[in-house]
A protein has these predicted regions:
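Catalytic-adjacent loop/helix segments of enzymes that bind and process anionic phosphate/sulfate esters
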Residues: 27-55, 61, 129-196
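N-terminal secretory/membrane-targeting segments
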Residues: 1-71, 87-91, 98-99, 104-106, ...
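Beta1/beta-strand and adjacent pyrophosphate-binding region of the FAD-binding site
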Residues: 72-77
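His/Cys-centered metal/cofactor-coordination and adjacent catalytic loops
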Residues: 68, 82-157
């Protein structure tokens, strides 16, 4: 919030005392009093957002829950890729995937758009630490962090085989370390990936 010197539970409308979560409670957002936040601001955008969030009932299910059970999951991170080049004649597999799968169209590169930051966001579902440099990226740190909730580890825990591939050398951006730590069997051009 603008003008707030520090963020505390009470500044977000929540109790400052510790909260015990039930097995059905998985989101800290449940402890935020959005109605109180809405009444405490004159900013119409914040007020409308808070009023909307006050009406949302947290749930573990949505329209996609279970829809793709027992299907394979393939994610493609293609830097500088233009969807105009997906055609039935030139790229039949990509064409089929884009017409029968789920595509996230509102995916944008991060500020200081370097490869490692976009790849980090896709793999982790988090924003990268923008204070880091290209050679000291968030991905480098991800090689040693505990990452049970990133996609590869989460799927592996559910019994999936998880693979990641890159058509360049494996130690570039430390992918040979980070991708293994994220739960993938990783292959690159210099480590097992046969590029023809």
């Amino acid at each position: 919030r603008s003008g707030t010197s520090s963020i505390t539970p009470s500044s977000l409308g929540a109790s400052s005392s510790p909260r015990t979560y039930s097995s059905n409670s998985y989101n800290v957002i449940e402890s935020i009093d959005f109605a109180a936040l809405a009444s405490g601001t004159n900013d119409e955008t914040l007020k409308n957002t808070d009023q909307y969030l006050a009406t949302v009932i947290p749930t573990r299910k949505n329209n996609y829950t279970g829809l793709l059970k027992d299907y394979n999951l393939i994610t493609i991170c293609a830097e500088s890729f233009c969807p105009w080049f997906i055609s039935e004649e030139l790229t039949p597999t990509l064409y089929k995937m884009t017409h029968t799968g789920i595509i996230f169209e509102n995916y944008y590169g991060t500020f200081q758009s370097v490869t490692t930051n976009g790849e980090y966001t896709m793999c982790m579902g988090l924003y990268p630490d923008m204070s880091r440099t290209k050679t000291d990226s968030s991905f480098n740190v991800a090689g040693t962090n505990y990452l049970p909730f990133c996609l590869g580890n989460a799927l592996k825990k559910k019994g999936y085989q998880t693979w990641a591939y890159h058509d360049y050398i494996g130690d570039f951006y430390n992918r040979n370390i980070t991708h293994a730590n994220m739960g993938y069997t990783f292959q690159a051009a210099d480590s097992g990936l046969d590029i023809k």
